Amino acid sequence: MDAYEVTIGQFKKFLKSSGYKPDDAIDWNGVYEYSPTEKHPMIYVSWHGATAYAKWAGKRLPTEKEWEIAARGGWKNKEYSWGDNESLARDYANYDGTGGEDKWKYCAPVGSLKPNGYGLFDMAGNVYEWCQDWYGSRQKYRVLRGGSWFFNANSLRVANRNDNAPNVRFYHYGFRCVSGSN
């Protein structure tokens, strides 16, 4: 599992060298409004765009199971990637509920907060991360995990799940990659 979410800078290199064209043009003004530097996570990226990037990088999106194991950081039966104490969330996660006590209005640069027990950053908060899996048996929506800056601490729970259609892009959706086959 990559230690960091894919950044804007990394995604731009992919676009330039691969020639990949998303179905709809990327709204870079929107991207930079919420994620203002090349070191911030790439947002407004669909599951299709995330998958294309991963393939270009010789990687893939994590399965939901892989994502959850990695997010737990070695903990078992704990609510969050850092344990059970929600009051520590500000040290590990960028989310809506910091009471203005963090430095970021929206996304934080990747790796700005403490890593989990496996040395992985931003496994809780910052941006929801696309996973390989379908959400449910109807195969209409893809899984997103991890919570985001837009949601409260409840979204930071390791077991929290979200979903959306694979062509959807939002200002709080991003991704990270994993090496190897599933």
Segments predicted by a language model, with ranges:
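Functional-site microenvironments in short loops/helix caps that host divalent-cation chemistry
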Residues: 27-162, 166-171, 178
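A short glycine-rich, aromatic-capped structural motif
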Residues: 1-28, 44-48, 125
